[in-house]
């Protein structure tokens, strides 16, 4: 064989070898491609994966796994960053898997952070403004008292709205016991309420002031004492005697009751003089509405029941002897009978019973008062044919009602009529 033939043979062998190596390499690359399924599969080190797979990485072991996305998982997968084949081929096999870069998500996140920062800054500013303007109840009360002191001594129409607003705020604040005492300690009775109740010509202001008075005295023994010491009892009695305004009478009754309830000394001093006469004058007035008259008999009934309750409890409580002694002095029977309480109630019910037919709550108030004061008025009421007619008319109307409350009131009236007239069989009108 010549040398030329040997060279040709060796060249052919080399070419064939290269082709085999290239084919093997291509086969290896194909077998090394990641084929995704619906199950999790381990990703080999350096192994490329197609886009759009669900990828998870164990941060402790470094194990990477991937699978096809479910429909509910679209848009949540980790994906390799290169978009084109050239970029993927040039990518280092050892470089970690990257998230898709989504400028819109990043910009949105930045925008939200800035908005939150702005909102927080605005919140801090608003809070500082709130702190600057914040006032405790005590500070508000002192401020309102000072505001009243700065009003003109002569009544000005331009100040009326401001005065009413001040009184409305005080009525709300003084329901609390401590606030009421702070108002009193800072001169509120002398500088605000007393001048209005005694001297002011505005009915609206007097009504508002008496509401404030009732608010601060209700269930507040220390405040009741201060109000009593300022002689508000007599001033309220005068208003009840002379006023014909429905709102003013209602407000005066509220303040009057707040002063007297659970305060036997005030009851003795006020009711033994002008107080009882003032209440009965309200009952006798043809210009006063029935609801206000119901408030009068309710107050009288409450005070009579209060005395009875205290005396009953004190019998078994030696420590209550001083309280009992104060209530023993209360002679409601003579205070009520002398100015004509029994006759006044008789007249109200006899003349206005038709109005009671549609006011069961008012009927109950009168029925309770009749029961409470029955002992001192039996001789008058049992002989009154007008009263009997009125009570039986209302009772019969309510007895035929389908309303449960009216039925209960009718039963109360039936028992009352039986005791007063002792003729249960007579139900004719």
From Swiss-Prot:
Localization terms from the record: Endoplasmic reticulum lumen
One GO CC annotation: endoplasmic reticulum
Coiled-coil segments on the chain, per record: 104-135
Domain of life from the UniProt record: Eukaryota
Chain spans, region Disordered: 70-98
InterPro entries: ARM-like, ARM-type_fold, Hsp70_NEF-Inhibitors
Main location: endoplasmic reticulum
Positions with biased composition (Polar residues): 75-84
Keyword field: Coiled coil, Endoplasmic reticulum, Glycoprotein, Protein transport, Signal, Translocation, Transport
Short sequence motif Prevents secretion from ER: positions: 426-429
List of glycosylated residues: 29, 150, 199, 400
Extent of Basic and acidic residues compositional bias: 85-94
Keyword Ion transport tagged: no
Disulphides: none
Alphabetized GO MF terms: adenyl-nucleotide exchange factor activity
Signal peptide feature range: 1-24
GO biological process, one term: SRP-dependent cotranslational protein targeting to membrane, translocation
Keyword Coiled coil among record annotations: yes
Similarity field: Belongs to the SIL1 family.
Function: Required for protein translocation and folding in the endoplasmic reticulum (ER). Functions as a nucleotide exchange factor for an ER lumenal chaperone of HSP70 family.
Name of this chain's protein: Nucleotide exchange factor Sil1
């Amino acid at each position: 064989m010549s040398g030329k033939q040997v060279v040709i043979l060796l060249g052919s062998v080399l070419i064939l070898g290269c082709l085999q190596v290239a084919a093997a390499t291509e086969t290896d690359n194909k077998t090394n491609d990641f084929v995704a399924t619906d199950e999790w599969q381990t990703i080999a080190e350096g192994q490329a994966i197609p886009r759009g797979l669900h990828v998870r990485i164990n941060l402790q072991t470094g194990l990477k796994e991937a699978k096809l996305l479910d429909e509910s998982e679209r848009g949540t997968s980790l994906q390799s960053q290169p978009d084109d084949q050239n970029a993927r081929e040039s990518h280092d096999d050892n470089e970690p898997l990257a998230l898709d870069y989504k400028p819109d998500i990043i910009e949105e996140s930045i925008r939200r952070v800035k908005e939150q920062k702005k909102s927080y800054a605005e919140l801090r500013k608003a809070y500082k403004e709130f702190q600057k303007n914040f006032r405790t109840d005590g500070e508000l009360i002192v401020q309102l008292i000072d505001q009243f002191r700065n009003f003109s001594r002569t009544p000005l129409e331009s100040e009326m709205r401001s005065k009413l607003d001040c009184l409305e705020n005080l009525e709300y604040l003084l329901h609390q016991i401590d606030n009421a005492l702070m108002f009193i300690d800072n001169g509120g009775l002398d500088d605000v309420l007393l001048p209005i109740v005694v001297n002011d010509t505005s009915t609206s202001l007097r009504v508002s002031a008496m509401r404030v008075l009732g608010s601060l005295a209700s269930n507040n023994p220390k405040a009741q004492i201060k109000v009593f010491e300022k002689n508000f009892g007599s001033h309220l009695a005068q208003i009840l005697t002379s006023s014909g305004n429905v709102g003013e009478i209602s407000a005066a009754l509220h303040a009057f009751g707040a002063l007297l309830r659970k305060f036997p000394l005030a009851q003795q001093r006020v009711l033994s003089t002008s107080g009882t006469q003032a209440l009965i004058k309200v009952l006798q007035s043809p210009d006063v509405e029935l609801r206000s008259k119901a408030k009068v008999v309710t107050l009288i009934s409450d005070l009579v029941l209060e005395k009875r309750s205290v005396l009953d409890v004190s019998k078994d409580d030696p420590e209550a002897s001083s309280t009992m002694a104060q209530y023993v002095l209360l002679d409601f029977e003579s205070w009520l009978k002398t100015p004509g309480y029994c006759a006044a109630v008789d007249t109200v019910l006899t003349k206005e019973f038709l109005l009671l037919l549609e006011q069961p709550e008012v009927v109950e108030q009168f029925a309770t008062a009749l029961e409470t004061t029955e002992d001192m008025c039996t001789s008058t009421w049992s002989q009154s044919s007008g009263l009997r007619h009125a009570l039986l008319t209302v009772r019969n109307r309510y007895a035929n009602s389908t309303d449960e409350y009216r039925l209960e009131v009718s039963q109360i009236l039936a028992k009352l009529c039986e005791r007063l007239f002792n003729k249960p069989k007579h139900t004719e009108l």
